[in-house]
Structures are given as C-alpha cells and as structure tokens.
Amino acid sequence: MKKMFIAFAMFMSCSLMMWANGVVPTRFDERMDLMAVIWRMAGAREYNQCKISPYVNSVDSTFKPFASHKAIALAKRYMKKNGVGYDAVASMAAHLKLTDEGTLTIDEDIASDIDDRWSTAMQKEFVTALNDFYKMTEFHKWFVENEPIQKQCLDAFSEISSNIDLDWFAQTFDSGDANFNIILCPLAEMNNYGISTRHSDGTNVLSPVISCSKYDNGSISYESEEVLPIVIHEFCHAYCNPIIDKRWNSIAKKAEEAFRIKKRILSQQAYVTAKIMMYETLVRTSVIRYEQQHNSNTDVWQLIDKEEELGFILVADILKAWNQNLASNPGDILAESINNFSTEAYCAKVAEEEKRSVNYTCNITDGEKNVASGDFTFTITFDRQMELWSRHTWQAVPGKRW
C-alpha cells in the first residue's frame, strides 16, 4: 500500500496541477452572529472562546443587560434537553430569513433540512423570542457598528479565500451546481461548521462557518497552512455526508465495528455514532486527496497516521482504493474499501504495537541525594525509529535513541 502512495506522489510531482484562483465570497452574516451571541449569553462553551478581545468586549457590554431575555432562556433549555449547540446553532442561522422590515422568519425558499435537534415546535417558539431579542437589543445597530473589526477579519482572510480550487469539488464529486461562500464568525472560535442549504430552484449553497482567527496586539490573522485545509474540510461535508447517507445500508455493519474499536476517542471529539464517524472519515480522506493533488510535498502517511490517532482507522483503506481508481467518485469505491477492512487484523496490529518497549537511562543513580549541579544525560531508547512529526516540543531527531 505504501508503494502505491509513493507512486501516486511521484506522479503528482511530475505533473503539477494548476487551478483557477477564483475568490470565494467571504462575509460576516448577521443571522449567524445573532445566534452566536445568544448561545454565548446562554453559556455555551463553544461560543465563549473568541480571541478577538474588542469583539468580545463589545458583545458582552451590549448584551449582558439582556441575560434574562426569553431567547436566552430558551437557548439554555434547548442545550440541556435537546443538545442544541455547535453546528445546530449554525444550521438554524442558515435557515433564517431577515426581511427588509427587520423581521426574522424560517426561510421557506430553503428545503426543510434544518438540524433535527430543532423540532418544528421549537423552531416556532424560538423564532418568536428571537424577533423580540433582535428588536429589543437593537442588534442590527450593534452589527453595523462592528464593521471595522469585521473588515479586519475579511482583509486578513483574503489570501485564503482567493486560493481555493473550486473546480476540484465538481471534478471529484461529479457535481457542479454548488454556490460557494464562506461565513466568518469569531464568536464560534475553535469550531467550524460545514453548513449547506438547498434552495427551491435546486441551487446548493455551501456556506461553511469558519473561525480560526489569531489575535495579537490588535492584529487579526488567519494562518493559511492551518485554515485552508479546514475550509476544504467544511466544503467537503456538503458532498461527503450525502454519499454516506446514500450507501449507509451497505457499509453500516463494518462501520459499526470500526466505531466500537475507537468509540472512546471519537466520542471525546463529539463523534458519537458510527454514521457521524463515517461522515468525518470520508471528509478527512477527501482533504488528504486534495492535499495530494495540490501540493507535491504532501506527506500522505503523516496525514493518515494523524487521522488514525484521532480514531479514523478507515482513512488509509478508502484512500488506497480511491487512488487506485483515479477517475472515480469516492462513492463508487466506498462500500468495497470499507467492507474489506479487517477489524480483527487491525486489533491484532494494535496489540502487537502495545508490546513494544521504551527504555531509559540516566547518569544519576536512582535515589541519590545531594547531587552536585552539572550536566546530566537522560537517554530514551525506543525499539524503532522515531517519526520526524512526533508530537513533542524538542527538535525532531530521527533514529531509535534521543
């Protein structure tokens, strides 16, 4: 399998792909900020990690006086009883329509695919309270007053939004009807959501919510190497999730087996079902494939190993099958690659790895007292070579001994 990946990488380095740098429209969205503010006031951890202090100060000073408002009380109740948080908040924002008269309604032009944590009764109840909050707090006025900070974010993000190969999605997933745009939301910091909506005319609007900003001494920035793969990841959800849904019955058994093996680590990341794991697995595989096709220096095995550490143990097999069928849609190879995965062989490999040892020595005698100051040597010896990307803060040193 490794030879196959190396051969593919060599092919890519010999035929560098070029792509049109069409700028993806990027904006702040008043509906998203409105929902984020309410969930922040309701105490949602995922909406209380913004790093841009002027924005945070503006939010808190403006809206804390309304902490007892019904919209915030409902948000607290929905979080506790229905698990409405994270992407469910962004999903509601995407399905809202803000009229010229300043009224919020559920947009009837969008297919009713709002996150299923929102019941119809909850939607109706919440929108009524939301309208009152919007008017009472003069939310639109606050949103407009913060345009200078928004502009800083948009300017900082422009390098990323102009360097996305949109044609790749149509070519990879055999779909060309998508309308791409990006919503920046610093209030969602440390979380990003792959939101998409299908309109009555058939248009599929992909509008991922992206945070990932850095703030230092008044300067806002977005690191391209870190953020661009996240944007690709969130765009991929709009394509990958339906592929999994369509083929779920044919892969469910093996997916459930894989999920049981890694349930603990996956659940810690909020991937709490086998189907959610598979959404993420196919998306993460797609991002690696994008990296392969746009950067000849991509270390495929490093990316695969990192995904396996996070519990996504099917990535390598899907990517292998996909690379062996370069022209295929991932859905065409999905069932075969997953169903050929041996959970028994994987568990045996893990058990063997756990037997491997690490030894250490030091030139200080164990238990020695009154040790004089000076240079000491602490040697760690592994039973194999260390990887250059190993997660430590020391200088990477290949070999068995450090």
For the regions a language model picked out, list residue spans one by one:
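N-terminal mature-domain "stem" immediately C-terminal to a signal peptide or N-terminal signal-anchor/transmembrane
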Residues: 21-103, 310-319, 327, 331
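Auxiliary, metal-adjacent structural segments of Zn-dependent hydrolase domains
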Residues: 147-204
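Active-site scaffold of zinc-dependent metalloenzymes
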Residues: 108-113, 193-225
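Pan-zinc metallopeptidase signature
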Residues: 285-362, 387
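Bacterial Sec-dependent N-terminal signal peptides
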Residues: 1-23
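Short, surface-exposed alpha-helix to beta-strand junction/turn motifs within ectodomains of secreted
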Residues: 373-402
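Post-HEXXH active-site segment of zinc metalloproteases
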Residues: 241-268
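Active-site recognition of the HExxH zinc-binding catalytic motif
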Residues: 225-246
